[in-house]
């Protein structure tokens, strides 16, 4: 009996994994330029971390988490997102005590949500995200957004749309919450069952409803922008000013909310309007969360971050027909003729690889013609032929895989020759 991977997961095979490495390399290099440092947190955490951090009323906590009891009955959950773990680590490891703030972190890794599998959406999916914790300067909001946009641009995307909103401070959100209840309570029976619960528990969440039947009702919703106090208005204006100064175009959408409860002030999404998608598709989202460290038992440390789906980034590259991460082939393939040459090539191959040269030999006892075919399939820059005659003469015949030019190289000079001619 064979085995298949679980529904909602995928194998990332050679040929495809190079594309992942390409975008992950861009993400890491961009983070280095912005001085964000990598953090690696456990794949599972105590369930309460997410129920308190993400929000009891969210779809993630209510419907989508992979939760299980360990052998001692403790409730654990596979992480559905990265912010809660990063903030927990910030508090637990007292990163707030570092003399230079904000603490700038990034992560790349798998997350888990029990969602309906569909194109570009998996139950195990990969996110790249950043968190800047310890500053409530609007400039850091602009920096976080700029970093996300930079990653997409460097990866090769051009059909991007940035949408921003302000969720205001606690006072502003309370006023807006009351306005939403007053406006929609008389029509509560017209909403889907989920939104009926949300209106009572967390009214802002109804604006994030994906049900078509509710969209017409939500068009009449009171705008959060009408309920921002002066401090929140000034903060949002400053964020917009910085984005304009940087040269990043954006749209303000007063109905934009994020699906997690911890957000306040700035919220944003980056979308692709590439024709290959057929519809505008959200690639990344994030925002400010100024109370999360205190929720986790730490000191007040305002934060902001984002998460982007690696799968959706790659899908966006496909939608724009951008080819990335192609296998560039190997530096050298050694064709061996006879047992002595094969025996010698094993140690020679080791020396080449230790010198940083990608090289391969035949392990299937193929004849010379078959070995040359393998070299072609591996897109070898150079094909070296080694037989008993070459060994007796202390040399190796080298063919340029592109031009076909051939020459005899002394075995003592072979590594130096390859390093000189394959270094980019």
UniProtKB/Swiss-Prot annotation:
What is the designated name of this protein? Histidine--tRNA ligase
List the PANTHER family hit by this protein, alphabetically.
HISTIDINE--TRNA LIGASE, MITOCHONDRIAL-RELATED (PTHR43707:SF1), HISTIDYL-TRNA SYNTHETASE (PTHR43707)
Instruction: Output the superkingdom of the source species.
Output: Bacteria
What subcellular compartments does it reside in? Cytoplasm
Subunit: Homodimer.
GO terms assigned for molecular function: ATP binding; catalytic activity, acting on a protein; histidine-tRNA ligase activity; transferase activity
Sorted keywords for this record are: Aminoacyl-tRNA synthetase, ATP-binding, Cytoplasm, Ligase, Nucleotide-binding, Protein biosynthesis
Gene Ontology biological process: histidyl-tRNA aminoacylation
Q: What is its EC number?
A: 6.1.1.21
Per the record, the similarity remark reads: Belongs to the class-II aminoacyl-tRNA synthetase family.
The record lists the catalysed reaction(s) as: tRNA(His) + L-histidine + ATP = L-histidyl-tRNA(His) + AMP + diphosphate + H(+)
GO cellular component, alphabetical, reads: cytoplasm
Q: Does the keyword Protein biosynthesis apply?
A: yes
InterPro entries given in the database record = aa-tRNA-synth_II (IPR006195), aa-tRNA-synth_II/BPL/LPL (IPR045864), Anticodon-bd (IPR004154), Anticodon-bd_dom_sf (IPR036621), His-tRNA-ligase (IPR015807), HisRS-like_core (IPR041715), HisRS/HisZ (IPR004516), HisRS_anticodon (IPR033656)
Q: What class of enzyme is it?
A: ligase
Xref: HAMAP family: His_tRNA_synth (MF_00127)
């Amino acid at each position: 009996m064979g085995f298949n991977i679980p529904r909602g997961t995928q194998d990332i095979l050679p040929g495809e994994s190079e594309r992942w490495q390409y975008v992950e390399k861009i993400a890491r290099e961009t983070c280095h330029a912005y001085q964000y440092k990598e953090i690696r947190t456990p794949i599972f955490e105590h369930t309460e971390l997410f129920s308190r951090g993400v929000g009891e009323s969210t779809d993630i906590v209510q419907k989508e988490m992979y939760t299980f009891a360990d052998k001692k009955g403790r409730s654990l959950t596979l992480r559905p997102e990265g912010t809660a773990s990063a903030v927990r680590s910030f508090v637990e490891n007292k990163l707030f005590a570092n003399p230079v703030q904000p603490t700038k972190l990034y992560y790349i890794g798998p997350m888990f949500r029990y969602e309906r599998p569909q194109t570009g959406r998996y139950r195990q999916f990969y996110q790249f995200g950043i968190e800047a914790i310890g500053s409530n300067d609007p400039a850091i909001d602009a920096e976080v957004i700029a970093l996300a946009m930079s990653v997409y641009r460097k990866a090769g995307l051009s059909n991007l749309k940035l949408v921003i909103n302000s969720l205001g401070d606690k006072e502003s959100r309370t006023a807006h919450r009351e306005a939403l209840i007053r406006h929609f309570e008389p029509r509560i029976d017209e909403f889907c069952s989920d939104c009926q619960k949300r209106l009572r528990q967390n009214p802002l969440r109804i604006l994030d409803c994906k049900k078509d039947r509710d969209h017409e009702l939500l068009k009449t919703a009171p705008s959060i922008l009408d309920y921002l106090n002066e401090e929140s208005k000034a903060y949002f204006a400053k964020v917009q000013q910085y984005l304009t100064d940087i040269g990043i175009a954006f749209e303000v959408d007063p109905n934009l909310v994020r699906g997690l409860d911890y957000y306040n002030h700035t919220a944003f999404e980056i979308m692709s309007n590439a024709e290959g998608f057929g519809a505008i598709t959200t690639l990344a989202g994030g925002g400010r969360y100024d109370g999360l460290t205190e929720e986790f038992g730490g000191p007040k440390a305002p934060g902001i971050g984002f998460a982007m789906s690696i799968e959706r980034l790659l899908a966006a590259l496909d939608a724009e027909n951008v080819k990335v991460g192609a296998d560039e082939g190997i530096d050298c393939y050694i064709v061996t003729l006879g047992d002595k040459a094969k025996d010698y090539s094993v140690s020679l191959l080791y020396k080449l690889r230790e010198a940083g040269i990608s090289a391969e030999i035949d392990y299937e006892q193929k004849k010379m013609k078959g070995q040359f075919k393998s070299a072609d399939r591996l897109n070898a820059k150079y094909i070296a032929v080694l037989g008993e005659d070459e060994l007796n003469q202390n040399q190796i015949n080298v063919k340029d895989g592109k031009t076909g030019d051939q020459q005899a190289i002394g075995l003592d000079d072979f590594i130096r020759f390859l390093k000189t001619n394959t270094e980019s």
